[in-house]
């Protein structure tokens, strides 16, 4: 990776450590060699709940900068996200989380992008499923009754649209799928005709 590289981590552990991926992320974001070559890091995942206050959305070490689900709509971010939210019928939470290695003192604050996909418009979702079938042979009708599958398919298109709105649509951006949950977003990154993302699984 060269300087100026943005690394997007698509994961179900964007906000809290649940299992192994959380430990991996903690290691990345407090590792000097990673921080030296990754100019920008963004965590992407679904918003699992709208319960609680806006201050709790990104966990105890998080700072929420924008949250349409809570009515926190600063103009700079609203311009970037409003069209995406209307088109896909999703909510967006955006901010930062701080990761610290208590032994070394190394810390960093990657961006966090969460998307509430519970009420997604069916049109764009079905179009994405069609494109996944045509290009990759993925038969979503076999799995879409499983929310564990469906929510991550719904995440893909608005996540890539939001990343583009945040200024990351070029070859210096790497979309990393952590486990199967990130695959639909990585596939949308490949399918998007106006982007030049690189992808890793």
Walk through the language-model features, giving the residues of each.
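Residues at the starts of beta-strands that form the adenosine-phosphate
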Residues: 6, 39-40, 198-199
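Conserved nucleotide-sugar donor-interacting segment of glycosyltransferase catalytic cores
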Residues: 151-201
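A conserved catalytic-core segment of Leloir-type glycosyltransferases
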Residues: 43-170
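Nucleotide-activated donor-dependent transferases that construct or modify glycoconjugates
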Residues: 2-18, 45-47, 71-77
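A short, Lys/Arg-enriched amphipathic alpha-helix followed by its capping loop at the start of a domain
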Residues: 27-39
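A short, glycine/small-residue-rich beta-strand->loop->alpha-helix junction that serves as a flexible
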Residues: 12-26, 54
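Short, well-ordered beta-to-alpha junction loops that form the rim of enzyme active sites
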Residues: 12, 46-47, 117-118, 177-180
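Flexible loop/turn segments at secondary-structure boundaries
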Residues: 15-18, 49-52, 121-123, 181-185
